[in-house]
């Protein structure tokens, strides 16, 4: 089958002819329709320090997808051939304490589709049926293909009660922008998102952010005054992994504020802990999606009128995958979709 693989320990990604995966007793075989390029895939493409330590070669990569069930193992229940599905890319062990307690997203033995095992940038993908999520008929293939990153946004944004709150999001990548849309949809008052990429800030404006702030030109403190906020932000969603952005967030949080962190900062990031301690801030780390509460919330948010379509800015045939990666790497895009049909 046709597949995009990381063949060599160097920058790049390659179209290959890979063997069709075999279906185990508890697995689904999914014929891929659409995939989306994730920031993780860009790290793998660039072969940065994280990728060099994490990614085996050769391996089929990719983990954002939608497809159709074409075969299944003999033990599978609840699915049928023809079902349209996406899936949770974190494969969990089922026997650690967190798995047995129902906190599956905190499994300490997690492996990742397209990271530690064969991925979705291929004509066919095998995953455990447990990880598959049926897509409702009124949700498009395009939106279903980005459920994985949308889930990161939903998990982060809904970590705390947002109704009537003032929310600061640092980092206007696709996940940060989707988090802004979620926050407005569920009833936040002011949603302010910051970045230095004007293209993506404009996308955030289209998606409903109260203010999209280019911090190269404008101070958050001035935006707070302009919006009539007298006590700082109630909720912070850190999506950038940039130390200066995180410290700016801490400076502008209200006392008793809550911060959810999805962005991965450098390991040696300096933090002004006085801001955390004396303001009584709560900081929560976010990894992946809650299984499978986040997935049901994603579908319900879209069905209740949340419009994510503006975040999908480019689509390419899989044969033009290089153009898709180039566009994603340029930073002048939202989500980039590769079509396998």
UniProtKB/Swiss-Prot annotation:
Return the annotated site residues (Important for catalytic activity for the proton relay mechanism but does not participate directly in the coordination of zinc atom): 148
Q: Which compartments does it reside in?
A: Cytoplasm
Group of enzyme by EC: oxidoreductase
Give yes or no: UniProt keyword Transferase: no
Instruction: Give the residues the record marks as binding Zn(2+) 2.
Output: 93, 96, 99, 107
| PROSITE patterns (UniProt xref) | ADH_ZINC
Residues annotated for Zn(2+) 1 binding in this entry: 38, 63-64
Q: Which residues form the active site?
A: 40, 43
- Primary role: Catalyzes the NAD(+)-dependent oxidation of L-threonine to 2-amino-3-ketobutyrate.
**GO molecular-function terms, A-Z:** L-threonine 3-dehydrogenase activity; zinc ion binding
Return the similarity comment.
Answer: Belongs to the zinc-containing alcohol dehydrogenase family.
Tell me the cofactors it needs: Zn(2+)
| HAMAP family according to UniProt | Thr_dehydrog
Q: How does it assemble?
A: Homotetramer.
Catalytically driven reaction(s): L-threonine + NAD(+) = (2S)-2-amino-3-oxobutanoate + NADH + H(+)
Pathway(s) of this molecule: Amino-acid degradation; L-threonine degradation via oxydo-reductase pathway; glycine from L-threonine: step 1/2
Q: What is this protein called?
A: L-threonine 3-dehydrogenase
Q: What is its EC number?
A: 1.1.1.103
Kindly list the positions annotated as binding NAD(+).
175, 195, 200, 262-264, 286-287
**Gene name of this polypeptide:** tdh
Q: Which PANTHER family match?
A: L-THREONINE 3-DEHYDROGENASE
């Amino acid at each position: 089958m046709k597949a995009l693989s990381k063949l060599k320990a160097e920058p790049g990604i390659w179209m290959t002819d890979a063997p069709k995966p075999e279906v185990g007793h508890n697995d689904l075989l999914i014929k891929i329709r659409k995939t989306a390029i994730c920031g993780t895939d860009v790290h793998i493409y660039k072969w940065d320090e994280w990728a060099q330590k994490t990614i085996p070669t050769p391996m089929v990569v990719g983990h954002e997808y939608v497809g159709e069930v074409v075969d299944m193992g003999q033990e599978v229940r609840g699915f049928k051939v023809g079902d349209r599905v996406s899936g949770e890319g974190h494969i969990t062990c089922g026997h650690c304490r967190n798995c047995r307690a129902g906190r599956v997203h905190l499994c300490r033995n997690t492996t990742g589709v397209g990271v530690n095992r064969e991925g979705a940038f291929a004509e066919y993908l095998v995953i455990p049926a447990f990880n598959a999520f049926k897509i409702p008929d009124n949700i498009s293939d395009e939106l279903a293909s980005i459920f994985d990153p949308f889930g990161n946004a939903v998990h982060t944004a809904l970590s705390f009660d947002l109704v009537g709150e003032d929310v600061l999001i640092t980092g206007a990548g696709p996940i940060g922008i989707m988090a802004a849309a979620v926050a407005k949809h569920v009833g936040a008052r002011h949603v302010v998102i910051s970045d230095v990429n004007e293209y993506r800030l404009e996308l955030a404006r289209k998606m409903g952010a109260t203010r999209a702030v280019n911090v190269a030109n404008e101070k958050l403190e001035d935006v707070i005054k302009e919006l009539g906020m007298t006590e700082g932000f109630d909720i912070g969603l850190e999506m950038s992994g940039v130390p200066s952005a995180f410290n700016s967030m801490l400076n502008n949080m209200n006392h008793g504020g809550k911060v959810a962190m999805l962005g991965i900062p450098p390991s040696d990031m300096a933090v002004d802990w006085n801001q955390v301690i004396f303001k009584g801030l709560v900081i929560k780390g976010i990894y992946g999606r809650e299984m499978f509460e986040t997935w049901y919330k994603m579908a319900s948010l879209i069905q209740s009128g949340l419009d994510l379509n503006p975040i999908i800015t480019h689509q390419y045939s899989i044969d033009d995958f290089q153009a898709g990666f180039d566009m994603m790497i340029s930073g002048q895009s939202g989500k980039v979709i590769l079509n396998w049909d």
